[in-house]
A protein has these predicted regions:
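Alpha/beta catalytic barrel-like cores
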Residues: 1-117, 134, 138-144, 148-150, ...
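Conserved, mostly hydrophobic/aromatic
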Residues: 46, 121, 240
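Interdomain boundary/hinge elements
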Residues: 144-158, 260-269
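Phosphate/diphosphate-binding loops
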Residues: 151-171, 185, 281
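Aromatic-lined glycan-binding groove of carbohydrate-active enzymes
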Residues: 179-199
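Long hydrophobic segments that form regular secondary structure
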Residues: 215-265, 269-273
Length: 281
């Protein structure tokens, strides 16, 4: 009996503690949260959180949960990771993994296209970098998705970030030249450094990310400097994602000095950071 009382109470306390970061995904509660957060200046990126996917049944449930979000009239932007699409894959079966995940994500992208909902292909661990890039391009090279604009996340704390941006830019330029839609790259610092450090320490491998916050900040600015030009924004819109106001100011200055189209650049941050920023305008 005590357990039946304690667990619901603990859930309520936990939800209250993280309410500025995470909203309740249950249908009625989510609708209220979206209505409270949205205003004329904002667009909400809804990311369905959950434990790591370990089996196909879990992957099916996660994808159905994301599809349910896309079907909502009050949702127009969602994120999904390649690791949510299928059970863990064998690293030596890379091509098969790309084909399998592309097949599983295609119905989700087609649903988003039909619902005019933006999908962002998110990234988590370094080992998913090439997989995510290849799945993203394979999805959007399909004839039915040629005119659909989707996005992908790029983590600046990866040493490969600038090279990956160049690769995406060159691919997007060919896509647009062939009559396809531009794409969007959401540039983030990266949020899994403790996990990457743990993985490196357990295996004895070199750290996959850069070694310090300063290096990550520098890499972030390298990516923005490359991406924020008229010729590059014609193919790849940019999401400047993060709560560092210096990075936001830098992006604004580059837009002004280079005469860029402000509509081609979006600024993304957590609700608590956005609310604080708006309060001090």
């Amino acid at each position: 009996k005590r357990q039946r009382i304690a667990v619901p109470s603990a859930r309520r306390v936990l939800r209250h503690m993280v309410s500025h970061l995470i909203v309740d995904a249950r249908d009625r509660q989510l609708g209220k949260a979206i209505a409270a957060l949205r205003d004329e200046h904002t667009r909400l990126n809804i990311n369905l959180l959950g434990e790591a996917i370990l089996g196909q049944g879990e992957a099916d449930r996660r994808l159905e949960g994301i599809a349910a979000l896309i079907r909502r009239d009050d949702v127009d932007y969602v994120s999904v990771k390649v690791s949510a699409a299928t059970a863990p894959h064998a690293p030596y079966a890379f091509d098969e993994a790309v084909a399998d995940i592309t097949e599983r994500l295609t119905p989700l992208f087609e649903l988003a296209r039909d619902r005019d909902t933006f999908i962002n292909l998110d990234m988590e661990e370094y080992r998913d970098l090439d997989l995510t890039l290849n799945v993203f391009t394979a999805l959007l090279e399909q004839p039915g998705l040629r005119d659909y604009e989707a996005g992908i996340v790029l983590q600046a704390y990866l040493p490969d970030a600038l090279a990956a941006m160049v690769r995406l830019q060159e691919w997007a330029a060919r896509r647009v030249a062939a009559g396809g839609a531009p794409v969007k790259v959401r540039v983030v610092k990266g949020a899994n450094l403790p996990m990457e450090r743990m993985q490196a320490s357990l295996t004895g491998w070199p750290l996959a990310t850069v070694g310090s916050k300063q290096e990550a900040d520098t890499n972030y600015k390298r990516v923005l400097n490359y991406a924020l030009t008229p010729e590059h924004l014609a193919h790849v819109r940019i999401g400047v994602a993060g709560h560092n106001l210096f990075d936001v100011a830098l992006a604004h200055r580059l837009i002004e000095r280079r005469g860029l189209d402000p509509a081609a650049v979006e600024f993304e941050m957590l609700p608590v950071s956005y609310t604080h920023l708006r309060a001090h305008e």
